[in-house]
Amino acid sequence: MAVAYADKPNHFINFPLTQFEGFVLNYKGLQFQLLDEGVDCKIQTAPHISLAMLDIQPEDYRSVDVAIQEVIDDMHWGEGFQIKFDNPHILGRCIVLDVKGVEELHDDLVNYIRDKGCVADQSRKWIGHCTIAQLTNAALSIKENVDFINSMQFNYKITINPSSPARLEIVKLGAEKKDGFYETIVSHWMGIRFEYNPPTDKLAMIMGYCCLEVVRKELEEGDLPENDDDAWFKLSYHYENNSWFFRHVYRKSFYFRKSCQNLDCNCLGFYESSVEED
């Protein structure tokens, strides 16, 4: 089956950088150098990394939203990872930094989004970069400008871990910018989204064990199909009706999301175990 590419994209997956103060301070230093040198360019006011281009419609937003959450849930953090920015240079009409350390994240996002039936990534090879400014045609033709840009130095690293302010967002091309950020359709913190405190006691067993039999006991008779696979499918996509399952359980329980994703129970029968008295 042929792969569909977002060669005429209308959205992208955004990794905003404005919240990383140390990076932004150095980033703006580069922009100041350009302006001080008199290079005619339009400064980027919302520093970011475009992790994947998308060709999607509003009805696809929910699928891409869920794919982003699944990528975050499946991340193996360890001690975290580093994003490295260096080598200011001209790419097309833009002055950009090379970005290294997010290649695996790019691949995961593309694969998970495609698994949802949505179009992601372009036919040309993805190159991680961060735009500093866009040159005018006149500025691009001036050799002194090109030589100055090629002589610029930059080297900065950001460490991303579960406590970092890192986010993944769906942004429409041409979206407005405010205070260093794009207007977003969806924005998710990349930290580990474990939450063990259920909103009510009634949901505690469902969120803690993700056992289909427990779920059936908590729901009204006939709410779930008798076939287990059909039941998991209904739970996974129950948010279509904006039910309390999605609002209070699916969004809050890592285990429940993974159980729904795998169509399998995580409880191993422990919910029925009893404590023996001495």
From Swiss-Prot:
InterPro entries: Coronavirus_NS2A, NS2A-like. Pfam families: Corona_NS2A (PF05213). This is Non-structural protein 2a. Belongs to the coronaviruses ns2a protein family. It comes from Bovine coronavirus (strain LY-138). It comes from the Viruses.
